[in-house]
Amino acid sequence: MLKSIFAKRFASTGSYPGSTRITLPRRPAKKIQLGKSRPAIYHQFNVKMELSDGSVVIRRSQYPKGEIRLIQDQRNNPLWNPSRDDLVVVDANSGGSLDRFNKRYSSLFSVDSTTPNSSSETVELSEENKKKTQIKKEEKEDVSEKAFGMDDYLSLLDDSEQQIKSGKLASKKRDKK
């Protein structure tokens, strides 16, 4: 009885006469070991990238957008074109909310504090304060450059330090087969 079932099963081709059977290639069926999973395969789209000089390049990207315009790229970046003097680094956030926040609240976080007076006095005081702060900053930079030298780096390599020895070292164990 079983033979007749198997014979009928293997006798049928599974397709109607005249058709060709198409087989798709499959990945080899391997046992996936622990920690050896297959990498994820991501779909990639063809994206037209418009560079800053107007040229268009087609690239493959995972971002599903047809066209992307770049503000700054290798055509107008001073790192890629060191011989061009007309290039300036463009801040992408210059018109953003972070820049507006810095403009509005930068006076709150400044080190120098001034008391509000009449407008003419504040203008004169602010100019004097700016000059004083510039002089102080220059002096601090000079002192900091002179104070820190190669000896400070060598002091980090002091021989009196000892390594802390505690705990057990992990040892590799061979798998028994």
From Swiss-Prot:
Chain spans, region Sufficient for general mitochondrial translation: 36-118
InterPro entries found in the cross-reference section: Ribosomal_bL31m (IPR034600), Ribosomal_bL31m_N (IPR048874)
Family per similarity comment: Belongs to the bacterial ribosomal protein bL31 family. Highly divergent.
SUBUNIT field: Component of the mitochondrial large ribosomal subunit (mt-LSU). Mature yeast 74S mitochondrial ribosomes consist of a small (37S) and a large (54S) subunit. The 37S small subunit contains a 15S ribosomal RNA (15S mt-rRNA) and 34 different proteins. The 54S large subunit contains a 21S rRNA (21S mt-rRNA) and 46 different proteins.
Cleaved signal peptide residues: none
Naturally occurring in which organism (per UniProt): Saccharomyces cerevisiae (strain ATCC 204508 / S288c)
GO CC, alphabetical: mitochondrial inner membrane; mitochondrial large ribosomal subunit; mitochondrion
Region spans: Sufficient for dosage suppression of COX2 mutation: 87-177
Extent of Polar residues compositional bias: 111-123
GO BP annotations, alphabetical order: mitochondrial translation
Transit peptide: 1-14
Keyword terms of this UniProt record: Mitochondrion, Ribonucleoprotein, Ribosomal protein, Transit peptide
Protein's name in the database: Large ribosomal subunit protein bL31m
One GO MF term attached to the UniProt entry: structural constituent of ribosome
Biased composition (Basic and acidic residues): 127-144
Disordered, as annotated region: 111-144
Role of this protein: Component of the mitochondrial ribosome (mitoribosome), a dedicated translation machinery responsible for the synthesis of mitochondrial genome-encoded proteins, including at least some of the essential transmembrane subunits of the mitochondrial respiratory chain. The mitoribosomes are attached to the mitochondrial inner membrane and translation products are cotranslationally integrated into the membrane. Overexpression of bL31m suppresses mutations in the COX2 leader peptide-encoding and initiation codon regions.
Localization terms from the record: Mitochondrion
